[in-house]
């Protein structure tokens, strides 16, 4: 951490940790839409709508995290090849998916994203509590969405 005449500047460690989160939330928005478009079966409508909520939160998170990175004088990278190569989310099939399988995939993708946030949280908080507060908010929101999705079939 350094404070310069231009303000607080993130260390390479903080920048790298925020980039990991940015990569996963960006991937989550894509995975969420892939599932949203290709689900079929019982409970379609409610899962379809839950996935829209997940995507909306993921897009909001990616924007907030990227803008926080810029405020800390870091260049965020949301390029498709970076997101594709570096995200930690499970792979989603390129086919029609039954709702029960889609629920499992959605929860796994959310949990992977939250896992990344929890993994980097302590190091982020040690350097920048404001960035850690952002992570706290999205951890709470994503875990709530995972609970909603699991609960619709009595899995919570």
Set out the residue ranges of the language-model regions.
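Conserved alpha-helical segments that form or flank metal/cofactor-binding pockets of metalloenzymes
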Residues: 43-82, 152
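Disorder-to-helix initiation segments
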Residues: 2-21, 99-102, 106
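Heptad-repeat coiled-coil alpha-helices
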Residues: 34, 38-41, 71, 78, ...
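Amphipathic, non-transmembrane alpha-helical scaffold segments
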Residues: 18, 22, 48-55, 59, ...
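Charge-rich, acidic-biased intrinsically disordered regions
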Residues: 2, 6-9, 45-46, 52-53, ...
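A structural signal for well-ordered alpha-helices, especially hydrophobic packing surfaces
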Residues: 22, 29-32, 36, 55, ...
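Helix-loop segments that flank and shape redox-cofactor active sites
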Residues: 6-13, 28-54, 116-130
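Acidic/histidine-rich alpha-helical segments that form the ligand environment
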Residues: 67, 81-137
